[in-house]
């Protein structure tokens, strides 16, 4: 009985694909669209921001991954925290993060953003931006190369594709 069902299902799929019809899950389509159309907002705080600019320039060309830098948090779904986060700047980071629309992701770039880095023991430095905002991907290095940033972005794309469920609460965003 089960064998017959799977054979009929396979025949139907083959017949539809011959007619140019694609069968897939909504979660897969949403994951594909979200991962290939990230709009990052820069939060460049130190020297890591220079490497982020290099990754966006013509040699590495982040646009080919569907990424378009946006100046406003309301138009962004990815925040790249690049550099040393100080105690004075932490509330601004949280405020900008809260202004971003759902779904949103954070990439922590460099040793200083990941854990305080060279300034870890300074009284004025936050020991990792994950104490202020939830971080999805960490890119190590001081400063990390443009290749490392692009690799981190590719890992984030994989993570987004694995995310299931179309979660949207109109009451929360209204």
Swiss-Prot record:
Domain of life: Bacteria
Catalytic activity: a quinone + NADH + 5 H(+)(in) = a quinol + NAD(+) + 4 H(+)(out)
GO MF: 4 iron, 4 sulfur cluster binding; iron ion binding; NADH dehydrogenase (ubiquinone) activity; NADH:ubiquinone reductase (non-electrogenic) activity; quinone binding
EC id: 7.1.1.-
Localization per record: Cell inner membrane
Record note on cofactor: Binds 1 [4Fe-4S] cluster.
Disulfide linkage: none
Gene3D superfamilies registered for this protein in UniProt: 3.40.50.12280
Binding site for [4Fe-4S] cluster: 47-48, 112, 142
One of the GO biological process terms: electron transport coupled proton transport
Essential cofactor(s): [4Fe-4S] cluster
UniProt membrane topology term: Peripheral membrane protein
Signal sequence annotation: none
Alphabetically ordered keywords of this record: 4Fe-4S, Cell inner membrane, Cell membrane, Iron, Iron-sulfur, Membrane, Metal-binding, NAD, Quinone, Translocase, Transport, Ubiquinone
GO cellular component: plasma membrane; respiratory chain complex I
Record NCBIfam families: nuoB_fam, PRK06411.1
Complex formation: NDH-1 is composed of 14 different subunits. Subunits NuoB, C, D, E, F, and G constitute the peripheral sector of the complex.
Job description of the protein: NDH-1 shuttles electrons from NADH, via FMN and iron-sulfur (Fe-S) centers, to quinones in the respiratory chain. Couples the redox reaction to proton translocation (for every two electrons transferred, four hydrogen ions are translocated across the cytoplasmic membrane), and thus conserves the redox energy in a proton gradient.
Similarity field: Belongs to the complex I 20 kDa subunit family.
Protein name: NADH-quinone oxidoreductase subunit B
Gene coding for it: nuoB
């Amino acid at each position: 009985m089960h064998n017959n069902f799977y054979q009929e299902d396979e025949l139907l799929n083959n017949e539809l694909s011959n007619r140019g019809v694609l069968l897939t899950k909504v979660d897969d389509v949403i994951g594909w669209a979200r991962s290939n159309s990230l709009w990052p907002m820069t939060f460049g705080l130190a020297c890591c921001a220079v490497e982020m600019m290099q990754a966006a320039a013509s040699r590495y060309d982040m646009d080919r991954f569907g990424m378009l830098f946006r100046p406003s948090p309301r138009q962004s779904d990815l925040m790249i925290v690049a550099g040393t986060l100080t105690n004075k700047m932490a509330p601004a980071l949280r405020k900008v993060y809260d202004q971003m629309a759902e779904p949103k992701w954070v990439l922590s770039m460099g040793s200083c953003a990941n854990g305080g880095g060279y300034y870890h023991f300074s009284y004025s430095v936050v020991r990792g931006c994950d104490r202020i905002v939830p971080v999805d991907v960490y890119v190590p290095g001081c400063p990390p190369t443009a290749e490392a940033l692009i690799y981190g972005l590719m890992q984030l794309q994989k993570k987004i594709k694995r995310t299931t469920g179309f979660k949207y609460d109109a009451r929360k965003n209204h």
